[in-house]
Amino acid sequence: MRTKAPRTSSPKSAPLQARSPRTPAANGSTNGSTNGHAKTNGHAKSNGAAAPAKRGASAAKTTSKSAAKSSSTQKPTTAKANSALRKASRGSLLTHETAHLFKAGAITTDSPIIYVNGRMVPKSQAMVSVYDHGLLYGDGVFEGIRIYNGQIFKCGQHMERLWRCAEMIRLRIPVSRDEMVQIMHDCVAANNIRDGYIRLVVTRGFGTLGLDPRKCPVAGVICIADQIALYSPEQYEKGMKIIVAKRPRTPIECLDPRLKSLNYLNNILAKVEAIDQGCDEAIMLNLDGFVGECTGDNLFIIQGGRVYTPPTESGILEGITRRFVMDLCADMGIPCLLKNMRPEEVKTADEVFLTGSAAEIIAVTQIDEIKIGSGLEGPVTRRLRQAFKAIVQGREIPQD
């Protein structure tokens, strides 16, 4: 019988009261916007506290007309993207500058089109202020989300986690959940993506030098829809080699592992350890020496036909793909249990695999110098990976 990790409620602390900057003109912004979420005519409000982006008739209208049809020299995929971009322009997300670049065909070499604080802009114009606290201090939260068959995988759960994480750091997201979902759909359509990846970022926003979050009037919102390939096709077929990092996970008492924040330095330094040893991933242990997770993926082992994964109390992120795979095990009649594990137990497992939004399911065939099982992707891992693929390649993608 599968057991679930206990869930704790998110803190309901009110967002911190923001103070408007006294000198908004000297904002250091690299895109001319004082706070993000500027009106969609491309001109930021002078008080540095513009309203959140809105769609349709309620949004500020662009003065430019819809761009002309794509020329016959453009590739079909580009023509489709242009059509989607015209649709976005009717929703007042395009700036004047972007509309002109769009007409000139610049987006054919300057993709993806990215949502930045109320505007859809080419990659070269997707900029934030150098005074944004997300850049200065890693103050913000994010989500990585998969797109399958043009649909957003587990959209509801990702939105729930994003808002929960924002509440944990007392950050007010300046758009509603429905508006955020629409932003994602607009980015997917503008870039003509059928299968890809969405990166949603919410920063504390433009502020001043210094940690005080009250100096940031409005949070920043960025949405990128693009392709992603963390690992090679060969690694998915043959499995990957990983290490056990010497650097432990940040203790739960210092930073709640459920918080998907912009500060990933602990993970990055463990990743550097792996790279130095010719590997792409590393297992991170908690201070008690138990296995937590990898730098960007959750970890599972298979022993005696049973699947095990560390509980959230071991200091891991509650991965959405992790939860989906646990439910998939139950549907397939494979026992899946939560268990604290030492690295030695993982190294002697029959099979090991990792899960993540970007990684999906990938086998681990070697840890440090120890071969896992036969040294090939194991039969249970293969069954789960194939079942996962069958679901996400189907017509109806799980969205809640």
Segments predicted by a language model, with ranges:
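Glycine- and Gly-Pro-enriched alpha-helical subdomains that act as flexible
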Residues: 283-286, 290-312
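Conserved alpha/beta cores of soluble small-molecule-handling proteins
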Residues: 2-12, 19-22, 27, 31, ...
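Secondary-structure junction motif
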Residues: 321-322
